[in-house]
Amino acid sequence: MLVLLHAVFITVLTLLLLGRLQLLERLLLNHSFNLKTVADFNILYRSLAETRLLKVVLRLIFLVLLGFCCYRLLVILM
């Protein structure tokens, strides 16, 4: 039971992190209008690429934990 609660807790934290990353991505895109040099554009491009990669990894972790939670719940109910 403790493992299930731990997985649910981490799943919720992962969802919160995804929301924060989406907000960060929007803020970075809003600052794209203030770019003056190519170096600024390169920094923004790298930052956006890193946030997108992190979002993909967090979504994968979320799906794995969600599957684990569902599996544990089915085992407990049977």
UniProtKB/Swiss-Prot annotation:
The keyword Signal belongs to this UniProt entry's keyword annotation: yes
Topological type in the membrane: Single-pass membrane protein
Bilayer-spanning residue ranges: 58-78
UniProt KW Membrane keyword: yes
Topology Lumenal: residue spans: 24-57
UniProt keyword list: Host membrane, Membrane, Signal, Transmembrane, Transmembrane helix
InterPro entries in alphabetical order: Corona_7 (IPR003449)
Region (Interaction with PPP1CC/PP1-gamma): 54-65
Pfam families assigned to the protein according to its UniProt record, in alphabetical order: Corona_7 (PF02398)
Signal sequence extent: 1-23
Function: Inhibits the integrated stress response (ISR) in the infected cell by promoting EIF2S1/eIF-2alpha dephosphorylation. Acts as a functional homolog of host PPP1R15A/GADD34 to recruit PP1 phosphatase and dephosphorylate host EIF2S1/eIF-2alpha. May function in the formation of membrane-bound replication complexes or in the assembly of the virus.
Assembly notes: Interacts with serine/threonine-protein phosphatase PPP1CC/PP1-gamma; this interaction; this interaction probably promotes EIF2S1/eIF-2alpha dephosphorylation.
UniProt record similarity statement: Belongs to the coronaviruses ns7/ns7a protein family.
UniProt-recorded name of the protein: Non-structural protein 7
Lineage, broadest ranks: Viruses, Riboviria, Orthornavirae, Pisuviricota, Pisoniviricetes
